[in-house]
Amino acid sequence: MSQLGSRGRLWLQSPTGGPPPIFLPSDGQALVLGRGPLTQVTDRKCSRNQVELIADPESRTVAVKQLGVNPSTVGVHELKPGLSGSLSLGDVLYLVNGLYPLTLRWEELSTSGSQPDAPPDTPGDPEEGEDTEPQKKRVRKSSLGWESLKKLLVFTASGVKPQGKVAAFDLDGTLITTRSGKVFPTSPSDWRILYPEIPKKLQELAAEGYKLVIFTNQMGIGRGKLPAEVFKGKVEAVLEKLGVPFQVLVATHAGLNRKPVSGMWDHLQEQANEGIPISVEDSVFVGDAAGRLANWAPGRKKKDFSCADRLFALNVGLPFATPEEFFLKWPAARFELPAFDPRTISSAGPLYLPESSSLLSPNPEVVVAVGFPGAGKSTFIQEHLVSAGYVHVNRDTLGSWQRCVSSCQAALRQGKRVVIDNTNPDVPSRARYIQCAKDAGVPCRCFNFCATIEQARHNNRFREMTDPSHAPVSDMVMFSYRKQFEPPTLAEGFLEILEIPFRLQEHLDPALQRLYRQFSEG
């Protein structure tokens, strides 16, 4: 067994459902990883000796040297045979061709100094103790006052108790509004209780055994526009005015915690209710971002600015009401959900259309991909074409369309099949590759990825939440593509056009599938 460092050891973490942790030698010995049982990688593009790793526990870094032919990636840097890179804690090593991620982690020694704590999802040795019964999940007691967690603030007032049912509320526009009458508060004290009926209703809920919770998005804190301490003071003043104990969860950044994504609810259920299960059916969420249409009630001419609160309730499965419906007993107003519903997406359905065509050609050809950033092009191409021997040409990797053309021409001269993995929105961007095919005397086909802009934006948000190494794609880029887009036609010179519907990957981890099917933008 390798000697442990003075404080712990470095290890590599696979995605959920992947192989077990890979511990790195702490004595300077090299560890070679590649295709094999340790990584559970069977892709023949990955060499059995793909990378050499040398861990340095003192600096908590790992030197990575590529041994295999196909590229490994360290963080955002793609390696070549014989070249090296360095991993720091939290960095991701992609074993080959941007696939099979392994994240560098550090494991502290236990306080006893005899055995380090097991990493997440790693079972302990049953022989280490006499009692081999499964250990009970640790119950975390809620701390009174404020806690600053990663991209999340949590406040627990005195008197808050764990309960099996929750009455949860948005803050601005639901429990309070501006005293000035303006849309946004002009100062920390520019607020008042939205309706006089609210305090009494909250007292009734508390008496009925509900835990009272506030879920609020406050992106201004993460952007540095709203000082956290100022907002904390405002929350405490509001709670004092309401007169009942609340637990408050504040999302300060985009991502998993920001409504409508369910991260704040997940934290409440898993970390902030002292192990008491919460009945979703017996709970409720109240919010004003409900997707209501213009003129949704007499005197209410403006449509809702967002649907995030209603979508948050949908994601969690909570009964939902607006403040007017809940506190004033107004009838339900008409509303509209987003055009794209991620709950409808699955791994079923045709891989491509028409199904009578062949996805792959046995002979040299050029395949030109067309589709929004986030339409699923690269994943599909890597999984189905590159794995079958097609040469992958990508502008993000090569840097310019001129280099893409040169790479395409070089591959065709070698009798290779080529796939152009760019967005290619218009006729001129596609024509250069059609010309490459004509010059080489080979056919050119188009793979048109059918994801709409709404779905592509959803896909990009999903990638940002699940892959820290993925560069965000701005809305400006997305709308620019939509403006440039010209549907591909056979008249351009394509032999065939295949339509590629977006499908979830069949091997996607169930937890990631659940996350993908959540609404992620209001």
UniProtKB/Swiss-Prot annotation:
Modification type N-acetylmethionine: residues: M1
Effect of K45N: No effect on phosphopeptide recognition
Reaction(s) the record says it catalyses: a 3'end (2'-deoxyribonucleotide 3'-phosphate)-DNA + H2O = a 3'-end 2'-deoxyribonucleotide-DNA + phosphate; a 5'-end dephospho-2'-deoxyribonucleoside-DNA + ATP = a 5'-end 5'-phospho-2'-deoxyribonucleoside-DNA + ADP + H(+)
One protein family per Pfam: FHA_2
Region of interest: Phosphatase: 145-336
Region (Kinase): 340-517
Origin: domain of life: Eukaryota
Record's subcellular location: Nucleus
Residues modified as Phosphoserine: S114
Residues that coordinate or bind ATP: G371, F372, P373, G374, A375, G376, K377, S378
GO cellular component: nucleus; SCF ubiquitin ligase complex; site of double-strand break
Keywords: Acetylation, ATP-binding, DNA damage, DNA repair, Hydrolase, Kinase, Multifunctional enzyme, Nucleotide-binding, Nucleus, Phosphoprotein, Transferase
Positions where Phosphothreonine occurs in the chain: T122
InterPro entries: FHA_2, HAD-like_sf, HAD-SF_hydro_IIIA, HAD_sf, P-loop_NTPase, PNK3P, PNKP, Polynucleotide_phosphatase
E.C. number: 3.1.3.32, 2.7.1.78
GO molecular function terms attached to this record: ATP binding; ATP-dependent polydeoxyribonucleotide 5'-hydroxyl-kinase activity; polynucleotide 3'-phosphatase activity; ubiquitin-like ligase-substrate adaptor activity
Stated family: In the N-terminal section; belongs to the DNA 3' phosphatase family.
Functional note: Plays a key role in the repair of DNA damage, functioning as part of both the non-homologous end-joining (NHEJ) and base excision repair (BER) pathways. Through its two catalytic activities, PNK ensures that DNA termini are compatible with extension and ligation by either removing 3'-phosphates from, or by phosphorylating 5'-hydroxyl groups on, the ribose sugar of the DNA backbone.
Subunit organization: Monomer. Interacts (via FHA domain) with XRCC4; mainly interacts with XRCC4 phosphorylated by CK2 but is also able to interact at much lower level with unphosphorylated PNKP.
Domain remark from Swiss-Prot or TrEMBL: The FHA domain binds threonine-phosphorylated peptides from XRCC1/4, and is responsible for the recruitment of PNKP to the sites of DNA repair. The affinity is ten times greater if peptides are also phosphorylated on the serine preceeding the phosphothreonine.
Entry protein name: Bifunctional polynucleotide phosphatase/kinase
